[in-house]
Amino acid sequence: MSSNTVAQFATELKMPANVLLEQLRSAGVDLNSVDDAVTDSDKAKLLDSLRRAHGATEGKKITLTRRQTSEIRQADATGRSRTIQVEVRKKRVFVKRDPSEIALEQARADAAASDAAPAEPAPAAAEPSASAPVTAPVNAPAADAPQAPATAAPDTAAPAAETPSQPPAVEPQPAPVAQAEPEPQPEPVAKPAEAPAEPAAPAAVEAHAEREAEQAPPEPAVQAEIETAPAPAAESAQAARPEPVTPKAEPAPAASKPARAEGRRGAPVPVAAPAVDSAGREEARRAAEAEAAALREMLNRPRKVLRAPEPEAGALSGTLHKPAGKAAAPGAKKDAKPGAGGSKKTIKTAEVASTWSDDASRKKPADTKSAAPSRDGWRAGGKGGKGGRNSRNQQAERRHEPAPQEFIAREVHVPETISVADLAHKMSVKAAEVIKQLMKLGQMVTINQVLDQETAMIVVEELGHVAIAAKLDDPEAFLDETPVASEAEALPRAPVVTVMGHVDHGKTSLLDYIRRAKVASGEAGGITQHIGAYHVETARGVVTFLDTPGHEAFTAMRARGAKATDIVILVVAADDGVMPQTREAIHHAKAGGVPLVVAVNKIDKPEANPERVKQELVAEEVVPEEYGGDVPFVPVSAKTGAGIDDLLENVLLQAEILELTAPVEAPAKGLVIEARLDKGRGPVATILVQSGTLKRGDVVLAGASFGRVRAMVDENGKQIQEAGPSIPVEIQGLTEVPAAGDELIALADERKAREIALFRQGKFRDVKLARQQAAKLESMFDNLGEGTQTLPLIVKTDVQGSQEALVASLTKLSTDEVRVQVVHAAVGGISESDINLAIASNAVVIGFNVRAEQSAKKLAESNGIDVRYYNIIYDAVDEVKAAMSGMLAPEKKEEVIGLVEVREVYSISRIGNVAGCMVLDGLVRRDSQIRLLRNNVVHWTGHLDSLRRFKDDVKEVKSGFDCGLTLRGSNDIQVGDQLEVFEIKEIARTL
């Protein structure tokens, strides 16, 4: 802080302003008040006056403090890099020796030069020795006593000053400086020591002078004077620490080198106590005056930033703390013998200044390793700094500022959705930049918020990068990169045969005879409601059969069966002919390009007519071989077994023509035929292996579910270890129930399987939400019509295929007046959560081949939820249809029940007109509606108000009797009018 007035100067010196004003006046400075300005020359005069008044006491110690702030980037536990502020403080204390003591030691060193010359020089990097203590002379100030041994401390890191080759240009008086151990406190302490024998000077003025000296940038000549003054004691301090020295071309007196060598060998420096005489005091006073003049000149110079001289290439082989310098030091010492007049030596100013600047460059990698500064980092500097402390800090900050990097325009592939953090990472910028740009665009986002592709591309373009609309990051592309199964050897495989046909035409019975097992008798209602997969070993080879349902509800299931098959056996009953599901099976087979084999079943029945079946199939473009077509017709009987062998022979012949092959030694691929949720085993899927070999323990992916095959059983319930092509198996271990018809693939990497499954779940969720949104919009328009009722249902089935069929059948029942709403449909037993959902939506729970848990039953009973169980799809559809019929608005029908003629009209006060009537036909009831006819034209329609016979109120009057009646709300009755009596009946409607 620069002080411009006496008051500011006094505040800086922490002394009263009037005392400072008196001192300035006594020093010859013409100032009248504390508000007058104080110049640098006035301060120099004050300092000179105080020194004259208190003797030649000078500042014995100068403290230099250096502070550097830098940043390092370090990764935290989450992997993100964080910026950490690092502040490094360095501090040096320089102590000045007494001139008389230096002169005495110089004389002794010159006297001992001849003795030390022939001695072998010690290595420069000798071990630290404490045998060379520096003892202050008697006339040294008492404050120097604790600092002298500090100069010989073994961990002193800064080099000492060398003997000057010629006197300094600015100051005639040398100012020897020896480096002392740094103070422990972080703040600079610039308080000069005072001799006890001399009068004490004001400490604040001395401290301010030293601070001014620190802040003022010294000239090179002044630096040279300070750094190259003769300092034998400092050299003896040097002997107590290792110091690598590199020789540099510089002339120097030869006498100082033996003295330094002697000091490094650890020889004690004899110190005498010279008598303090008047001549010594006069010499000290002259030295003080010279130094004061130099300080005044220094303070009056304009400030400028000086740069330390750059070291020559190869001149500095190591730093003060690097072992490289130890090897170079002995050679340098040998070259610096006294006899070598033209030898060169290292200039400490250049060396130390370079190490000071090198320290800044070494500091950056050191900071990245540890946030705390290392012990040797702050000592590696030298005395050749640039100007004052502030300028050095500014220079250091400039050096450590990250160099501005050139902007790199990147190509950024933007997917359909991307988070702010991921987008910033792709552009190699901070997320804050992306958020800032989005705020400029008027969008407030967080770092984890997901952006759509269009917005993200705008941000990328705004930040100067090239945006490329990338395809969705579909991990299913990994499936295309898997080893192709065709690389493995393709071997012949068994044909997969699907049995299709109309319901009750004998498909399962036919398979039952082939398998020699009673399956049909175990089916509920004698009809098949699941796909059954079996493989049969015949004398001609293995054949895999898929039995599909024939009921109309199972269209999707039959389509899946046709997709997975090689050959279709179309079963047609000889006594029934072609039916709707027969035609549908033909269409499925043709759409899949699958060859047909027609089995005309039930030929053992008396009413069987195979020829009629052929004619009907020809109409459906299924031409038998005897008619010139390519479809074999085989008459069979599932009851007697007639024609079964011919059927199998035709099937195997078709398979032989197809030349069915599949790789065996390859990862398995297959199709989910059926899936269900087993209470004890979890999700269970029936898989038809189409290629490769599925082994127990394989990681499989089926639609949006994945897992490891924990158990594998065949259709007979036996545990197996592997399944080859065309073999149906049941597997356990999937995470959830897959959808029937999903493709199954075995993967080597479970992580990749999980990734693909989660991706598919996300896609399915998006599609489902989009469908729900569309359905809500449609239902909104549908519900605009009045009287639309909704029947909410919750459907739980045993297998996924049955759920699909039942939901489709129930949804078809919807009409304009009553709509079926399937609130929830899933595979598995009826749980408590299903009942809670039914309570919330007021739904009916339908269980198809499943039962409710005990807790769910109690909850349903207590809340009045209707739970219905079915095992035949007909019954479920019929009962829901009946319930919907009950919800239909009844049909209203008008029925005429009588005819009355008005014979007389009586007018009675307070009542009005009363009609005396005769019932001509039918009867008249009191609550009936009346239509008044006048000249056979309807004149009024309303209700009877009262009906009397004589004086009694009656409920009805039959034909042939007279009565009196009044009309509600009408008195317009005339003789001869006819009253038509009618009732409105409600008739229940059906769907």
From Swiss-Prot:
Keywords: Cytoplasm, GTP-binding, Initiation factor, Nucleotide-binding, Protein biosynthesis
Domain of life: Bacteria
GO molecular function, one term: guanosine tetraphosphate binding
Biased composition (Low complexity): 106-164, 190-206, 221-258, 267-276
Presence of the UniProt keyword Transcription regulation in the record: no
Alphabetized InterPro entries for the sequence: DNA-bd_dom_put_sf (IPR009061), EF-G-like_DII (IPR053905), EFTu-like_2 (IPR004161), IF2_assoc_dom_bac (IPR013575), IF2_II (IPR044145), IF2_N (IPR006847), P-loop_NTPase (IPR027417), Small_GTP-bd (IPR005225)
Cited PROSITE patterns: G_TR_2, IF2
Region G4, annotated ranges: 601-604
Limits of the tr-type G domain: 492-659
Family (UniProt): Belongs to the TRAFAC class translation factor GTPase superfamily. Classic translation factor GTPase family. IF-2 subfamily.
Name of the molecule in the record: Translation initiation factor IF-2
